[in-house]
Amino acid sequence: MSIEKVYDYFHNYDSKVYQIFACMGNEPSEKDILNFEKQYDISLPDDFKEFTMSPLGGLYMEVREELWPRAKVYDVAPFWTFCRGIMVYGIAKGIPDYLDIRVKTKELHDEGLEDYIPFFSIIGDGNTIFCFDKNNRIVALDWYFKVAFEEDEMNFSDFLLKKIKELEERKMQMIETLENRKN
């Protein structure tokens, strides 16, 4: 199962490159997940539920500041240079609002976008949020235009691994960009 590949990645990730926060120790129970599903009359994908109930649920993963400095107010740069991390929303007790799937779902539904359950976003991209639609397909939802675009057909685990790979590619590009500025 591809969720094992996700766990393998995080067992071996480079902690000198990424800082990672997750619910570790505050994992939600199966009952917490069922209550959320019942509230929104949905059934979340099994691999997402497993991930959410693991110590990695409510994941915040960001390239360390020393390697990829945060943008300053009024910085002008290519869009990708602002996208220095990822977040997977969770249901853990005491989870910050910006990582809480319940808070994010309420925000989305209050905007009239009730056919979607948000579960993922890229740090630095305030317009796009990734959601499960009513059929558990993964869609990229543009907050501004309120339009959903279907992602490639894949499960949550493969999607997460793809987004981590894209983050690693951006990190390498940023390191190269910063090196070129020094020379």
Question: How would you label these PLM feature ranges?
Answer:
Residues 136-146:
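Intrinsically disordered, low-complexity regulatory segments enriched in Ser/Thr/Pro
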Residues 1-124, 181:
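A surface-exposed partner-binding patch
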Residues 124-125, 135:
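Short strand-connecting beta-turns/loops that link adjacent beta-strands
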Residues 149-169:
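Compact, glycine/acidic-enriched structural inserts
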Residues 118, 127-132:
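Short, surface-exposed beta-strand/loop micro-motifs that present aromatic residues
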Residues 166-182:
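Acidic, carboxylate-rich catalytic segments that either coordinate divalent cations
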Residues 65-66, 132-137:
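Short, surface-exposed, charged loop/turn segments at secondary-structure junctions
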